[in-house]
Amino acid sequence: MIDDDGYRPNVGIVICNRQGEVLWARRYGQHSWQFPQGGINPGETPEQAMYRELFEEVGLNKKDVRILASTRNWLRYKLPKRLVRWDTKPVCIGQKQRWFLLQLMCNEADINMQRSSTPEFDGWRWVSYWYPVRQVVSFKRDVYRRVMKEFAPTVMPVQEAAPPRVPPAYRRKRG
């Protein structure tokens, strides 16, 4: 289902723990990481799609999470030209997304990325709240920044809700 502007309706999911960290998932067989996301099927509401994707990609059910917030508007990103499938009709040039902020209510051991017959992810970890904005693939970065800025007051105290001006350097453990 592609809209008239060439965007595929989609939901994005930010899952946070009680420490304000967020679930960061590694794409299956790749070195890229992102938040869970997926398309909205015909006849589905964004919330219904979110719960379906939550189960398919993370193995969690409605009872395992609590919705804390959702984005007020659709957020869009364009795909790089090399990723656009020009031979399909209609051509999808990007995604328009509604995002949900969820609080994990179950034990993290219940997270199971392998419930689907075609898993999207093969690993996950908890990361600091702003980490994904710096680490996601570049064409999604603006949407991630906007999502995290919108959700920040819900996750953390107001004085900490702005992204850091200069992101801390990433360091690998040596030795």
Swiss-Prot record:
Is Hydrolase one of the keywords?
Answer: yes
Organism domain of life:
Bacteria
Q: Name one GO molecular function term.
A: mRNA 5'-diphosphatase activity
One matching Pfam family is NUDIX
User: What are the UniProt keywords, alphabetically?
Assistant: Hydrolase
Cofactors required: a divalent metal cation
Q: Which PROSITE patterns match?
A: NUDIX, NUDIX_BOX
Spell out the GO cellular component terms annotated for this protein, sorted alphabetically and separated by semicolons. Answer: cytoplasm
Which EC number(s) does UniProt give? 3.6.1.-
First-tier enzyme category under EC:
hydrolase
Motif Nudix box location, chain numbering: 38-59
The residues covered by the Nudix hydrolase domain are 6-149
Name one process (GO BP) from the record: mRNA catabolic process
Say what the protein does: Accelerates the degradation of transcripts by removing pyrophosphate from the 5'-end of triphosphorylated RNA, leading to a more labile monophosphorylated state that can stimulate subsequent ribonuclease cleavage.
Report the family membership: Belongs to the Nudix hydrolase family. RppH subfamily.
Q: What is this protein called?
A: RNA pyrophosphohydrolase
Q: Which organism is it from?
A: Yersinia enterocolitica serotype O:8 / biotype 1B (strain NCTC 13174 / 8081)
Gene symbol here is: rppH
